[in-house]
Amino acid sequence: MFHILIGALLGLLFLATETRAQFQFFEQMFGGGGHQQQQDHREQNVASDSSWYQRNYDNAHCSDYLCPGTLACVSVPHHCPCQHPDVEDKFELGDGSAICISKGGFKANEAARKVELARKGLL
């Protein structure tokens, strides 16, 4: 009888420990729990308004033209780089301006070809 009681108590203790460990896992995975020391290591998100951008724009020094999208300093506006050059192609228009458009399919300069077709009214 004594062995059965000790076995039952040990089983309940083991079950309680496993349940607590399981909940701690979910708290960590989904950001719950409120453990202060874990939250101190997280980086803070940028503000949801334009204050971060405006602060960087105001502090940027450029003697020529400061590109509004990338804060790059270039000699003329159509030299501004695209914000996401890995997925965008830059296409210079004839009037001294430029646009950045999503890269086309598999062929080089496919996006530029589509812009030209659209300008001619063929697309």
UniProtKB/Swiss-Prot annotation:
What's an example GO BP annotation here?
A: ERAD pathway
* Family in the record: Belongs to the LCL2 family.
Q: Which species is listed as the source?
A: Paracoccidioides brasiliensis (strain Pb18)
The major lineage groups are: Eukaryota, Fungi, Dikarya, Ascomycota, Pezizomycotina
The name this protein goes by in its record: Long chronological lifespan protein 2
Which of UniProt's keywords are assigned here? Signal
Residues making up the signal peptide according to the UniProt record = 1-21
The protein's job, in short, is:
Probable component of the endoplasmic reticulum-associated degradation (ERAD) pathway.
